[in-house]
Amino acid sequence: MDGSPPHPAAHRDPGPGPGRRDLLRLGTLLAAGGLAAAVPAALARADTATGGGGEVTTTYRGHSPYGFDQWASVGFDVPDGVRRISVAAAFDPADGVLDLGMFGPTGFRGWSGGARREFTLSGSDATPGYVPGPIGAGRWSVALGPIVNDPAGMPWQISVTLHHGPPLPEVPYDVLPGAVPGRGPGWYRGDLHLHTVHSDGGRTTDQLVAAARAAGMHFIATSDHNTSSTGLSWRGNVPADLLVLNAEEVTTRHGHWLAVGLPQGEWVDWHYGPADAGVFDRHVRQVRGLGGLAVAAHPMTPAPGSFWEFGLDRVDALEIWNGPWTLDDAANIAVWHGMLCLGQRIAGLGNSDAHGPADAVGEPHNVVHAAGLSRPEILDALRRGRSYAAENTGVTVDFTAAAHGATAGPGEELPLALFEAVDVTAEVSGAPDAVITLHTEWGVMAVARTGGDGRGRLHWRGWGRGSLFARAEVRRLKPASTTLDQLVAVTNPIWFHAAGLAPYDAGQRTLVAAVRAADGSWGRHTALPGVQGTPAVAGVGASVAGLPDGTVLTLGLGTDGGLWLTTRKPEGAPGPWRRLSGPHGRDGGAFLDAAIAGFPDGSGEIVAVAADGTLHHQRVTAAGTASGRFRPVPGDASAGGRAGGRRGAVRAAVAALPDGSAQVVAYGTDGALHHRIRRTDGTWTGWTRLTGRAGAPAFSGQALAIAGLLDGSAQVLAVGLDGTVHHRVRRPDGTWTGFRPLPGAAAPAVAAGSVGIAGLPDGSAQVAAVGRDGTARHCTRRPDGSWTAWARIPGPDGRGAFRAGRIAVAPLPDGTLHLAAVATG
């Protein structure tokens, strides 16, 4: 007898199946990376005791200093005849955590992190997380990852027991099938981030398979922390109806990432950080070379070691939704969206990160369109973004874009000509009482609601290359643990340009200003100077307001969602930009849309849609400083009100009236256009849903603007979901005209992606619009209600065309018209 703990497999005939001896030989190539960063631990002393049955125990006592990012090892020699190694650790949890692992002469032999304080391994069995196999003579090391929160450090003790005896038989493992037979092209559901007892999970592999079947998954990936042992544990229990992908969650001290689709037994090292030049990229190449996928896991989680520090553009995909929806996931999506706006094609994934039996597998999961239910086909589809993430298997999203007789879905290209229309549709089921939103790099373009039956449809028409991509989200307007809403589904984008053709540079989307003189002539465009000396400021939105003394307030919405304000006094240059605090006074708050209007008393009013979809407002002084902070605009049930009486919106505009009141129009989360008045005493009227064209109960659209005139009327411009521009007047007595389309230059209606309107002292309304060809045009509504013809706004050099993505205009008392726009080159 060798004194080893008994194991039921100790006397089994190994039978057919892959052995581990050849596999472990490969570890010599990996050991150099795994132990290179682990310095020998500072040992106080080592005591050895001999027990019965051929056991020899050596106890090593050491001390680790305060710190998080440190690795150490305890080395020991193993003579011939040892058949089992057992390790036990002791430390005070009040001092920190001691992660554990093992390396042998042939390389990696296991990792349990902080999930266990003891483990054992032999040729026939091993504690989950550790690789069974021959106990070869030579130098072995217990790998340590001390996380010490006590400034005085953490003392610890490692006991290594060597069990001598006759050789133990090796136990073979089963090879996971690479495909589920008989499954061709279609949509498949799968969860790529799952843990078992081989790391810190509470399920065995058999229990995980049962949970995946119960959740309706077609494929899963077992992704335990820093170990390859999960893939070597399949013995007679390989499922035939579920595709199991072998994976590892590579858990560094600088971010976690999923190596998905690894061959069984393959191990990826984790002992490195961003300062180790080229190491991370080498391991990503290793995974890709094996046909796998590198995914940044929960990258914006602010916990130590979880927050991503390696650069998000160096992986194949981002886990933008990890487990139950939280504020961390909202940050993931915001960062991912910013990358998409730069033309970076990186897939977004959703996984449950389920650990214990109480964690639901597949909530959320990925719905993937693949050529078949096989490892290479699923991974290829995921890499290309041919997927969307859903909170459960009851949710489906049919997201498509159609143009020139072709149709594309998530992850596909639909290259457009400059003047070409594109129709984007999202059909949703299984999501009762939710909101569907369509996003491009210009923000939320359209919104629709689902009914109590869970079904809903959104349609939007865009023009030409006005957008790089489109993607859809479905949200439930009910609070979660840390958010005011809950994500139900999110799609990867459909791209409107070919991968081999560079999209227009997002850095060229600069904020510019121009002036139209009272005689109708246009001055040259001026790029607004950037922040901290940069030559220009990049943005995705712009608004402008004129004050009675000739001051111009310009509002810019940055590519990061920041809201910036600058002031230009008469005959002066624009002043420095000031970033406005976010909702509730937080610094660095992000917004989706914003507009500003100027009042007769010299103040301005800003309305802004926060990142969580709530509408806020704030007063600013003529000097461009905030007179308070953003406060929620009250909501009500008829206008898609949010929890706590807040108003939900996706786009908003504001107009100042001569009596000092303000009128606000907004596309609500119900997909309809609403109107509200803030009285001069600061109180609000209720929201009114505006009827649509030709008696339709509502008007839905993608862009809007409002202007107040001296007679107390207000004029509204709204771009419908079909891309055409409509006009409506609210008379001084509060009654409305109906919506009418604006006539085009050579068509009964004009199409546009952005509009601005301003009322001049002579009673006219000046209109600017970005047409479907991406160029800006101008026309005038005369006081008698007739319209002038459209004319191009000249380009920056005073000639040619002015290309823009967003546009706004504001009047001054001298009859000039001031324009603010996001130029696209």
Which residue stretches match the model-derived regions?
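C-terminal edge strands of extracellular/lumenal beta-sandwich accessory domains
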Residues: 52-53, 102-105, 133-189, 210-215
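N-terminal secretory signal peptides
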Residues: 1-18, 31-33, 37, 43-45
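Noncatalytic accessory or regulatory domains flanking protease catalytic cores in secreted, cell-surface
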Residues: 98-154, 453-459, 594, 704, ...
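Surface-exposed beta-strand/loop patches in noncatalytic accessory domains
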Residues: 53-68, 90-127, 576-581, 628-634, ...
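Trp- and S/T/G-rich repeat-edge/linker motifs of beta-rich repeat architectures
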Residues: 501-539, 562-592, 614-650, 672-702, ...
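N-terminal export leaders
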Residues: 19-29
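An N-terminally biased module of ancient metal coordination in phosphate/nucleic-acid-related enzymes
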Residues: 23-24, 169-254, 327, 356-358, ...
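Charged catalytic cores and adjacent phosphate/nucleic-acid-binding surfaces used
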Residues: 170, 174-183, 253-267, 303-501
